[in-house]
């Protein structure tokens, strides 16, 4: 048989064997031709075409899958929507029989189910087709590598190679009988293979066509499904709209039903509450009524007993009053003279110190600020200032003389008033004695009339009848004449006796009547005199108040003038000159870097930061490879906004970016430069996004020591962690004005401010000591452990010869010490001074028990001097240990002690004073040994002896740690005695805690290296008692001031001294006011009994201020604001600091609170004011008035403070409403124009308890 004919058989070249071959060659030719034809049939479709067709089918299959999934998701969404709609519809039908079911819902559900079934069928067909494709691919691969029935093709020409094996040799050289048999087998196998491959190809082609048809049919079905989906969407939208309408109707119905139900429930709840409240009130009233009845019974019994004791107590009270008056007169005279001498001595010392400071300051100012060219102008100005100062001094002296005259007159009037009061008391006593005698006589006369039953008229009538009878019977009854005469004689005698007694009683009554008339006349005269004296006293009081107001006004004017002059002097001496320059152009700068000149005003400077380039490390370069990095840097300096360098491409970026900052070289800026760093971040840009790849810290502290451009490099650290060493950054910075000039000006300015503020603190220190004495005197000695309570006064006067660790800076010194078991106490910071004046006074109330006695005899008081400008903590400038054994022997410790640093070198001196207020009485069980007596400082008034260092086994005292301080100089604010214990003042930082084993260099050594100039003084008990009385009196009188804190803080040194002079001699009737106020005194909580009840105080808190968008927010002259609070005629209180003006819609927080005390003993006038408010009298200031005041800026101190807005809180309305104002916003009205609302003020006014207390006290007067 011949093989199948093939049209492409002639396409391939076939070797012609020729006609010389035998029959065997012809058979071989036919077999090879068949194999060639089958291979041609298999290779008719190329491998690339098959792969291309397969890949196309694969891609189309994937697309069909994606499309089918999308359609499946859409169908699922539609199904869920339909389920929700059906559930909602069923629910609405259950609730209220909603809309009827639509007719096409069932059809749509059936259609959706049919579509889902079709999708599942298509997915199954798709999987079947995919499996067929995979099997076809595997078959094609098998066909491409199909093994023939021969392991190798036999060569037609003998090449002479060895045969592979014997079996191969036997195949190639078969026996003669087997040769043609093998050829037949080959011819039978090859046709079957070709047929099989052709059939497979045909099947694959048919399947591919079927797949194409299926794809086309699926596309048509998908289009139909999409069309159906759109129809379903439209139907769903229509159904959704209908359901939404029905839902809205149902919701409206439900809302109306719920509202009506809620209203009914609310009404029932209200009625129930009212019923419960009324029943509770009725039960409470019944209980109160029963209690009142019981109390009335007990009161009747106690009233009878009290009336019996009242007479005895009145007699004792009269005797005690007489004794008290005599003792008060003696005490007042002695106390007044001693206080006057002490005050004058203190004033002299303060004025001498102030004169020395001013002289030093003036010399420094003259040497540093005045140049030779303008010397004459400065001299003229200096002379003018001296003339003005002399004029002001003369005016002050005249004011002081007038004040002293007024005070002398007031003293004489007081003496006269006391004399008149004493005379009035004597006359009242005499009047009471006469009344008592008259009462006794009247009682005796009544008793006589009642016992004798004889009346004068009856007696005269009886005598007349007897006489008539005698005349009638004279003739007939003569024998009875003798008897009648005897009877008449007896009657006459008795009559005469009765007449004599009657005349005596009448005479005594006349005498008492005349005496009572005289006493009445004398009392009238005394009343007239008292009225005239009180009138005179009221007139004098009014004149005195007017004069005081005039003096206050004059002092305010004088303080404003002095403040203006000080501002001018500071501007001339301390301020920098205007600095105008054109920046120099360096060779490495671009020409157009600066295009205009820069004007620096007084106190300003220009700080420049230049980022040059970034050098990446080798690790970064290896990691980046051939890619170019696109980078830029960002950093934020001080309180300015973020700066960004240009974006640079490359592995060696050079930015050459310079940023300039206009800064004020002040304390905060210098501290920021010295301590803080600036974070520079390196970012990599990716089209519109970026990521941070590295960061570093830029330091600028070297600018304090160098000038000009300072070049620095710093290391970059990777943020991701894989490359820690990222590279380096090169940068430079500088100040345009040289830094040494700015530092010098800053030091002088800080020193001048320190001198000014230290003078303000002196009168407050005096008030501190006096009020501490007053508060301590109120503590009962019985409350201590041993029954004895004493008070130790520690005064740190000054330090001299202090040196900072940085040689070019002056220290900001302050002293810290810890006494007994009290917390650490630190003084105020005196900036930029080698010889700081602290004048810090502190009182420590302690019980005189065994623990204190042991502490005084075995311990020393360590004083540590720290530098606030030193960056290293726990490093003190100097330290001294003062032995306290002299205090155990009731002696004063006063002297100048040498300070030692941590290396035991001399670091200056410190002057301290330690003394007891009362006589120190050691406890009964204490034993004084000879060893302890060695530490007593010997009294040497003439020779000054330095004590050698002595070693003692004294328990080591841990050094206090310096606390972090703010560099703001503030004035210590008064707080109440109760607030001092329970609520610490927010403006004073908390005391430092004890630190044990904090560092080896801070802990004190066991030896006492002490060299002192000691002046111990023995004080007697009588002198200390008199001193205590004087200090208490001074503290009570100093507490009364007609100047507000704002006026005190804004005034000058002279004005603060004048304030102390004005307040030093006020009325003794108001002395008790200091009991309700006291400065920050350390009082143990165990002996604190002066806490005020809520009914004895009014608390006012100013929380925050908010301004609307008005003219005030747009005015440039108004920059800082503070709040003033005033109640009736009481002194105004101000917030301690003025804050920047808030923008529209923003709040600024003051958090300032003030307490007005209303205790009956010390503040009856304030209670009278509240009584008048409750009576709703027409008072000028019946509400609490808050005034928003603008504070002029520092560079324009010649401007005056201006009232911007006013807010009110009416106390009568508060009492009527029955609730306090707690953090409520009240309207602030414009105080300058039409009175419109300009903002809100958030305040707290707690006065309800106080108003209720006043109302209960004066209920009868208020209800009448």
UniProtKB/Swiss-Prot annotation:
Stored CDD domains: C2 (cd00030)
Free-text function comment from the UniProt entry: Negatively regulates signaling through the G-protein coupled thromboxane A2 receptor (TBXA2R). May be involved in mechanisms like programmed cell death, craniofacial development, patterning of the limbs, and formation of the left-right axis. Involved in the organization of apical junctions; the function is proposed to implicate a NPHP1-4-8 module. Does not seem to be strictly required for ciliogenesis. Involved in establishment of planar cell polarity such as in cochlear sensory epithelium and is proposed to implicate stabilization of disheveled proteins.
Residue ranges, compositional bias (Acidic residues): 1056-1080
Molecular function (Gene Ontology), one example: thromboxane A2 receptor binding
Gene: Rpgrip1l
Compartment(s) of residence: Cytoplasm; Cytoplasm, Cytoskeleton, Cilium basal body; Cytoplasm, Cytoskeleton, Cilium axoneme; Cytoplasm, Cytoskeleton, Microtubule organizing center, Centrosome
Family membership: Belongs to the RPGRIP1 family.
Boundaries of every C2 domain copy: 577-714, 773-897
Protein name: Protein fantom
Keyword set includes Kinase: no
SMART domains documented for this protein: C2
GO-annotated cellular components: axoneme; bicellular tight junction; cell-cell junction; centrosome; ciliary basal body; ciliary transition zone; cilium; cytoplasm
Pfam families named among the record's database cross-references: C2 (PF00168), C2-C2_1 (PF11618), RPGR1_C (PF18111)
Stretch list, region Disordered: 979-1018, 1047-1093
Biological processes, Gene Ontology terms: brain development; camera-type eye development; cerebellum development; cilium assembly; cochlea development; corpus callosum development; determination of left/right symmetry; embryonic forelimb morphogenesis
SUPFAM superfamilies: C2 domain (Calcium/lipid-binding domain, CaLB)
InterPro entries: C2-C2_1 (IPR021656), C2_dom (IPR000008), C2_domain_sf (IPR035892), RPGRIP1_C (IPR041091), RPGRIP1_fam (IPR031139)
Alphabetically ordered keywords of this record: Cell junction, Cell projection, Cilium, Coiled coil, Cytoplasm, Cytoskeleton, Repeat, Tight junction
Keyword match Repeat: yes
Ranges in coiled-coil conformation: 64-143, 196-268, 299-454, 488-555
Tissue-by-tissue expression: Ubiquitously expressed. Not found in heart and skin.
């Amino acid at each position: 048989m011949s093989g199948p004919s093939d049209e492409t058989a002639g396409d391939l070249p076939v070797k012609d064997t020729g006609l010389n071959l035998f029959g065997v060659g012809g058979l071989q030719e036919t077999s090879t031709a068949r194999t060639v034809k089958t291979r041609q049939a298999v290779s008719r479709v190329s491998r690339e075409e098959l792969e291309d067709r397969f890949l196309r089918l694969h891609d189309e299959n994937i697309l069909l899958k994606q499309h089918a999934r999308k359609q499946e998701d859409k169908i699922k969404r539609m199904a869920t929507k339909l389920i929700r709609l059906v559930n909602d519809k069923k629910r609405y039908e259950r609730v209220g029989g909603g809309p009827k079911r639509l007719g096409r819902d069932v059809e749509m559900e059936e259609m959706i189910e049919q579509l889902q079934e079709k999708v599942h069928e298509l997915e199954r067909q798709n999987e079947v087709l995919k499996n067929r494709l995979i099997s076809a691919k595997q078959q094609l691969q098998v066909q491409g590598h199909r093994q023939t029935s021969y392991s190798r093709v036999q060569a037609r020409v003998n090449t002479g190679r060895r045969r592979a094996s014997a079996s191969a040799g036997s195949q190639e050289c078969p026996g003669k009988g087997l040769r043609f048999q093998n050829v037949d087998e080959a011819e039978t196998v090859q046709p079957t293979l070709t047929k099989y491959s052709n059939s497979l190809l045909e099947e694959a082609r048919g399947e591919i066509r079927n797949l194409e048809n299926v794809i086309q049919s699926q596309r048509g079905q998908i289009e139909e499904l999409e069309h159906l989906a759109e129809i379903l969407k439209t139907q769903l939208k229509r159904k959704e709209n209908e359901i939404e309408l029905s839902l809205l109707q149902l919701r409206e119905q439900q809302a109306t039903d719920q509202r009506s139900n809620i209203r009914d429930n609310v009404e029932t709840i209200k009625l129930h509450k009212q019923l419960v409240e009324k029943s509770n009130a009725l039960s409470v009233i019944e209980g109160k009524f029963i209690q009142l009845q019981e109390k009335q019974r007990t009161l009747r019994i106690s009233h009878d007993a009290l009336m019996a004791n009242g007479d005895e107590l009145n007699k004792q009270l009269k005797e005690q009053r007489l004794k008290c008056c005599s003792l008060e007169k003696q005490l007042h005279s002695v106390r007044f003279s001693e206080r006057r001498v002490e005050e004058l001595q203190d004033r002299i010392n303060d004025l001498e110190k102030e004169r020395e400071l001013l002289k030093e300051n003036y010399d420094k100012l003259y040497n540093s600020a005045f140049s030779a060219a303008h010397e004459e102008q400065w001299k003229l100005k200096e002379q003018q200032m001296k003339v003005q100062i002399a004029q002001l001094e003369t005016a002050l002296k005249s004011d002081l003389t007038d004040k002293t005259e007024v005070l002398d007159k007031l003293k004489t009037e007081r003496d006269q008033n006391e004399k008149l009061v004493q005379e009035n008391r004597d006359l009242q006593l005499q009047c009471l004695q006469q009344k008592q005698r008259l009462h006794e006589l009247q009682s005796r006369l009544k008793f006589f009339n009642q016992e004798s039953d004889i009346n004068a008229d009856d007696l005269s009538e009886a005598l007349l009848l007897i006489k008539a009878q005698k005349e009638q019977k004279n003739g007939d009854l003569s024998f009875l004449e003798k008897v009648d005469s005897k009877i008449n004689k007896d009657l006459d005698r008795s009559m005469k006796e009765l007449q004599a007694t009657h005349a005596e009683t009448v005479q005594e009554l006349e005498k008492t009547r005349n005496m009572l008339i005289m006493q009445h006349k004398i009392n009238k005269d005394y009343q007239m005199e008292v009225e005239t004296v009180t009138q005179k006293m009221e007139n004098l009081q009014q004149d005195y108040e007017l004069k005081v107001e005039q003096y206050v006004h004059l002092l305010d004017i004088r303080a404003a003038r002095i403040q203006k002059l000080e501002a001018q002097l500071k501007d001339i001496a301390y301020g920098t000159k205007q600095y105008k320059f054109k920046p120099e152009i360096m060779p490495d700068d671009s020409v157009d870097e600066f295009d205009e000149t820069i004007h620096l005003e007084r106190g300003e400077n220009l700080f420049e930061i230049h980022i040059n380039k970034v050098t990446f490390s080798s690790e970064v370069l290896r990691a980046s490879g051939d890619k170019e990095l696109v980078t830029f840097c960002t950093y934020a300096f001080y309180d300015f906004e973020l700066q960004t360098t240009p974006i640079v491409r490359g592995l060696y970026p050079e930015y050459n970016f310079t940023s300039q900052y206009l800064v004020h070289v002040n304390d905060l800026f210098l501290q920021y430069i010295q301590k803080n760093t600036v974070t520079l971040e390196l970012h990599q840009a990716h089209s519109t996004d970026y990521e941070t790849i590295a960061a570093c810290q830029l330091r600028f502290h070297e600018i304090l020591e160098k000038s000009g451009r300072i070049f620095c490099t710093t290391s970059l650290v990777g943020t991701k962690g894989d490359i820690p060493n990222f590279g380096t950054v090169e940068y430079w910075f500088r100040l345009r004005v040289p830094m040494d000039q700015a530092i010098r000006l800053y030091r002088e300015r800080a020193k001048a401010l320190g001198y000014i503020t230290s003078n303000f603190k002196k009168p407050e220190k005096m008030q501190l000591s006096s009020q501490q004495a007053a508060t301590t005197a109120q503590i009962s000695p019985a409350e201590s452990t041993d029954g004895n309570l004493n008070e130790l006064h520690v005064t740190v006067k000054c330090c001299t010869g202090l040196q900072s660790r940085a040689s070019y800076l002056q220290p900001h010194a302050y002293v810290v010490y810890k006494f007994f078991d009290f917390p650490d106490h630190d003084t105020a910071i005196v900036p930029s001074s080698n010889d700081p004046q602290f004048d810090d006074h502190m009182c420590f109330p302690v019980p005189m028990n065994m623990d204190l006695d042991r502490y005084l005899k075995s311990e020393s008081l360590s004083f540590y001097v720290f530098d606030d400008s030193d960056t290293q903590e726990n490093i003190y400038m100097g330290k001294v240990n003062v032995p306290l054994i002299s205090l155990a022997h009731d002696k004063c410790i006063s002297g100048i002690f040498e300070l030692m640093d941590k290396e035991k070198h001399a670091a200056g001196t410190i002057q301290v004073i330690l003394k007891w207020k009362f006589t120190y009485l050691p406890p009964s069980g204490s034993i004084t040994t000879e060893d302890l007596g060695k530490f007593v400082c010997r009294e040497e008034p003439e020779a000054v002896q330095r004590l050698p260092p002595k070693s003692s086994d004294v328990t080591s005292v841990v050094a206090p740690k310096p606390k972090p301080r703010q560099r703001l100089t503030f004035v210590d604010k008064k707080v109440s005695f109760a607030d001092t214990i329970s609520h610490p003042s927010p403006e004073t930082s908390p005391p430092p805690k004890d630190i044990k084993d904090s560092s080896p260099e801070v802990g004190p050594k066991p030896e006492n290296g002490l060299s002192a100039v000691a002046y111990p003084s023995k004080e007697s008990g009588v002198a200390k008692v008199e001193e205590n009385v004087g200090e208490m009196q001074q503290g009570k009188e100093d507490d009364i001031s007609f100047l507000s804190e704002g006026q005190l803080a804004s005034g000058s040194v002279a004005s603060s001294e004048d304030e102390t002079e004005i307040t030093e001699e006020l009325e003794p009737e108001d002395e008790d006011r200091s009991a309700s106020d006291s400065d920050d005194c350390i009082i143990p909580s165990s002996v604190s009994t002066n806490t005020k009840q809520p009914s004895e105080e009014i608390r006012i808190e100013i929380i925050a201020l908010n301004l609307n968008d008005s003219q005030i927010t747009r005015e440039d002259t108004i920059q800082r604001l503070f709040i003033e609070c005033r109640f009736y005629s009481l002194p105004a209180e101000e917030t301690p600091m003025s804050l920047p003006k808030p923008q529209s819609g923003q709040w600024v927080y003051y958090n300032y609170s003030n307490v007005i005390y209303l205790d009956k003993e010390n503040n009856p006038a304030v209670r009278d004011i509240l009584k008048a408010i409750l009576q709703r009298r027409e008072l000028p200031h019946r509400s609490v008035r808050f005034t928003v005041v603008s504070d002029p800026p520092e560079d324009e101190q010649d401007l005056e403070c201006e009232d911007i807005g006013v807010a009110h809180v009416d106390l009568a309305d508060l009492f009527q409403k029955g609730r306090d104002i707690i953090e409520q916003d009240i309207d602030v009205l414009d105080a300058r124009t039409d009175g419109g609302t300009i903002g809100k003020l958030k305040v707290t006014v707690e006065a309800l308890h106080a108003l209720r207390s006043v109302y209960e006290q004066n209920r009868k007067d208020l209800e009448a």
